[in-house]
Amino acid sequence: MNLRPFKIDIPEREIFELKQRLSATRLPEKETVDDWSQGVPRAYLAELCSYWVDDYDWYETQGRLNRINQGLFRIEGIDIHYVEVRSNCDGAKPLLLTHGWPGSFLEFEKIIGPLTNPLEYGLDSKIACHVICPTLPGFGFSGKPIGVGWNVDRIA
């Protein structure tokens, strides 16, 4: 298997275009109820769009995520993204973490440190793991399936 290094590098143009689209969002009329029973409340959606345009720092997030070892490998014609973090602890066991739908490796970001370097978190080194977290086909930085039949059994 040919493992290739991977770094997240979203072009500035794409971030600019996303901010333009978010700024141009046509919000629906105010809902008739003050809860989520009819979907996402207009005020929440407006606040979320504003946050992504004015406050969210993609480059900080990208830098943080790039501190995690990532790579790509090709299987059945599709590039599969993965995260791999090895432990320095003797006797560490490999641990495969898989996300569900919808999801991504980000679900595991906060536990990778304690799993791979438990001593830094005041935990016993006996729980140390080498973490491998593939991104499912069609999710995140993995390629999209190019044919039919990509069901749970095939992906597993």
Where are the language model's segments positioned?
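N-terminal targeting or regulatory segments adjacent to alpha/beta-hydrolase or S9 domains
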Residues: 1-64
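Catalytic cores of eukaryotic secretory-pathway lumenal/extracellular enzymes that build
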Residues: 6, 24, 46-156
